[in-house]
Structure formats: structure tokens, C-alpha cells
Amino acid sequence: MKNSRDNWSSKIGVILAVAGSAVGLGNFLRFPVQAATNGGGAFIIPYLIAFLLLGIPLSWMEWTFGRYAGMHGHGTAPGAFYQIFKRPWAKYLGSLGLLPPLFISFYYIFVQSWILAFTYYSITGKLMEVVKADKITEFFNDYIMLNTKIGPVPAAIIFFLITFACNTALLSFGVRKGIERVNKVAMPILLIMGIILVIRVLTIPNIGQGLAYMWNPNFSELTNPQVWLAAAGQVFFTMSLGMGIILCYASYLKPKEDIVLSSLTAGATNGFAEIILGGTIVIPIAIIMMAGSNIEEIAKLGTFGLGFQAMPHVFGQLPLGNIMQTLWFGMLFFAGLTSAVSIIQPLISFCEDDLAFSRPKAISTISIVTFIGSVISILGLAAGAVDELDFWGGSFLLVVLGTIQAFIFSFVLAKQKSETHPEENKAFAMLNDGAALKLPRFFRPIILYVCPIYLLVLLVSWMATNGLDVLLLTSVKPDEMVTFLGFECSKIAFTWSLRIFLVLVTILLNVAIAFAWKNGKANKGRKTTIKQVELGNS
């Protein structure tokens, strides 16, 4: 079977796409809170160590897996793992590479729609009115709980449907004409908006005090294991590692594309957005403008409280506050847009490459699945559905898949001889293929041994500290009640019911994988032709 796949039209296109998948709410909201509550400037030390020993190596691994998968006509982990092991069970192990984006898609589009709504409210001046009336908390809660109406319909539902339609429309154009083009436009706009906000923040009187709160090192925190775990977790989260996204995007590379430099460039872009933009905008200005508040109080607001309540309040106190609010939510919207399409693309790629669906059929199928999951998130928001989905899709499974990938790269792919470079193993031959600057040999032990061990220690440490409590729900009070669809039930019962739903989704996914291989649509012998596209047509 000869299969023609889409591809990136330029190197800058794939770099911006991968960077766009990583740059999101985690950069502008999660990172500042993590840094401020884990030693301030001292947090950067374990963060950079984790970036060098964990983030960059695992990113190179995922780019390599993606290149290998694309050579055999696959764009996701089931196909990649199957080609590496040549064993039937490997494709089911690869389902772990589809579960994170699937689970995240169940809630991410809804959250993305909040940003679109608040961008609209900023432009119209409604948000400034709410801030001046000191009712931002009530306004936000009413909105997400579907109490804010446009006519008879909750505003949150309307903006969700608009956002869902926009994402679907962009994805319908494919990798080159859809994802690549939107990232070429959105990423520069996002960075420009971020730089404008940074410049404005740095001109605020006494901002040095806010920066001191953020960056004044508390080196005593470096002896706390939780700080190192938090730093590693932040690197994992912010670089989109273990999500199957980088693997999928790398599968659309042209032959001889430089993945060593491309990976570093994408990682550096994400780091700039996180450390320079995220670390400068949020906490420093919040400390200055929210008189009497300290880091701990601000951090307790959480990601959503900080982004949708604290920051509108803070910007509302500045001259031209509505413009600042619009820039803030506009920046977050472009970050959310580039992340959203990257989350859904691996699912579409699986349908196209392994189930042999057409692009429209693949998008329709995934849209139905994600819409059903989104409805559960919307209706179960107050009951904790989003938190539960984020734990599995945005935290736990990322580390599990990342650890598995690291061991496969180091102890399976790196043990296989390259057909094209007999003196080299398959892992590093593919990683260095087409690279202008080859990976230094002294860095190989870090990739082969330090990174897998680092990940294993991270996973075991988490299990030893609070992992079992989270998995078994022992920290949830038996008498804690939540409401879902108008019915009151215990939080434990709701959470286990949601987990049963996720297990059923996992089973159905593996049934789809079995169907793909049984019907010969994902067989190992097929050849792939990558469409060559001139740069001028991008």
C-alpha cells in the first residue's frame, strides 16, 4: 500500500508549530506560581538542570521516534512502537501515546473558549466594568457555571461552540495549510503581545519590588526534594513531553530535516516565553498592584484564578487598562489556539494513517469523540471533572509515557544497527541524519542513561510521596459531596465513575488499534510518499 502523507513546507514552520504546541497557559500562569512558591530565583537552578538532563534529551527522542514513524507511514506511538519492536503487543503499548491528547481534548477546548470569551469582554469594555465594580470573581464563576446568559443560552456554551468550530476549521486544512500557517501567524503575534506586556510591566513604579519577590533566590529551598520534583514536572508539562504531539509533528518532516537544531530552537522559544515573558508579567505585577497580598496568597488562586480573576483586576488598575486586558487575553488565546490544534492532530493522524480515514472523516470522528468528552467536562466542572482529566491526561500519563519512551530509545532502538550507517546504531543515526551540527558524543550518556534514570526516579518519588493517595483517593473526605446533572453524590463516587468512563474510552481506543492492524491499514510493509511542496506555496 502506498500512502501519501502531508508534510511541513519549511523548517521555520515545524519549529513554530512545535513551539506553539508547548507555549500555553503553563508558560504564563503555571510557571510563575511554581517559581514563586519553590524558592523564587533558586527555582531556576533545578529548572535548568531538568531542562538540560530531561527536557532536551526527551525532546530529541520524541523527534527521532516521529521521524522513524513517518518513514513507515505512521504519525503516532502505536505505529512507531510497532515498527520498533515488530511485535503485536507493541501497538497497544503505543496507545499510551494517544491517551494524553485524547483526555486533554475533553476539557482543553472548553477552557480555550473561556479565553475567547474574556478577550471579547475585554474588547467590548464589559470586563473593565466588572473589575471597577469589584465583581470579577462572581463574574468568572457565573460564566464557567453557565449562569451568564446570552438570551436563553449560557454564554459559555456559545463561546465553546465558536471555539470548537474554529479549531475544527483550522484542522480541516491539514498540517501544511492549516497547522503550519496558523502557527506562522499566531506565534509571532503571541510573542509581540508578550513583549509589549513585559515592557509595560517594567515601566510600573516600584516594579523592582515585585521582581524581587519573583526572582530573589531562597537557596535553602534547594534541599527540598519537592522543589526538584516541581521543576522537573514543570519542564515536562511546558515542553509538551509525553503527549505524543512532538512525535506526531516530527512524523511529517521531510527527509534529511535537521531535528537536532529544530528541537533546540523550539525548546529555546518555549523557554523564552516561559522565563522571560511568564516570569516577568504575572507575579511581579500582581505583587505590586494587589496590595497586602503575598506570593502564597496569590498562588492559592490557582492557574484559572490567577489568569481570569487576578490579572484582569491588576490590569484594570492601570491606565488604558482595557487595552492591557485585551493584550493579556489575546496573548493567552493565541497560545491556547496553537496548543489546541496540536493536541487534536495526533488523534486525526491515527485515523488517517492507521484507520485509512480521509481527512474529513477523521476530523468528523474525532470531533464527535471530543465533543462528547467536552460535554462531560462542562457539566461536571463543579464536581471536579476537569481536575481529574488534567491529572490523567496532563500529568500522570505524561511521565509514564515519557519514561517508557526513554527506555525504548536507550535500550531498544539504540541497540539496533542502522541500515544506512552500519557503524552507528539506529537511534543516533536517525537523530543525526541531516543535522548541520551533529549531537556531541559526550551528550550521549545523558540521553542513554541519565534521562531514563531521572524519569524513573521522578515517577517513583511521586508514588512514594503522594501518588498512592491521589490514585486511591484516600485524601478525599468520604462525606464530601458534589453535584452532577442536578443530582448530589459523593465526590469519591463521581471520580470513580469518571475513571470508569476513561477506562471504557481506553478500551475502545485499543479496539480501534486492533481493527487498524487486522484490516491491514497499518501494516509494517507499506511505503510512504511525502508530498514535496515548494516554500513559496506555504
Regions found by a protein language model. Give the residues of each.
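Transmembrane helix-boundary motif of multi-pass solute transporters/channels
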Residues: 10-50, 209, 245-247, 260-264, ...
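Membrane-interface "cap" regions at the ends of multi-pass membrane proteins
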Residues: 1-29, 58-63, 67-95, 254-258, ...
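Membrane-embedded translocation segments of transport machinery
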Residues: 2-12, 180, 184-337, 341, ...
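Transmembrane helix-loop junctions in multi-pass membrane proteins
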Residues: 25-34, 41, 167-178, 199-211, ...
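Hydrophobic alpha-helical segments of multi-pass membrane transport proteins
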Residues: 334-343, 363-373, 393-432, 450-465, ...
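Extracellular loop-to-transmembrane helix junctions
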Residues: 6, 35-65, 155, 398, ...
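A generic transmembrane alpha-helix motif of multi-pass inner-membrane proteins
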Residues: 155, 387-402, 439-538
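Inter-helical loop and helix-membrane interface segments of multi-pass membrane transporters/permeases
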Residues: 2-6, 34-38, 68, 73-96, ...
